[in-house]
Amino acid sequence: MKTILITGGAGYIGSHIVEQLVNINHNVVILDNLYTGYKSLVNTKAKFIKGDIKNIKLLRKIIKENEIETIVHLAALLNVSDAEKNKKKYYLNNIIGTSNLIRSCEN
């Protein structure tokens, strides 16, 4: 049985993916900062970690300690009008955060 990390797993799409993976008996770890997600959407059979993809040390720890085999990355900020006003926030989360996630997979 695979252990799968879902970033943004407490959001609408992420929580539905978690449900499906849990239903087919995968071990699921959710990483979500709850900026737009809701803890109430988290399946209790999944392991929930409140944290941020901008924290590369946390990402590396999660991947190593949970022996993550697969990652589904859904932790993104999406509001276009807000992105125009807060470019740095969106850059840090969507670009740097994704880069951190990729780098954390390196051995």
Go through each PLM region and give its residues:
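N-terminal Rossmann-like NAD(P)+-binding domain of SDR-like oxidoreductases, especially those catalyzing
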Residues: 1-107
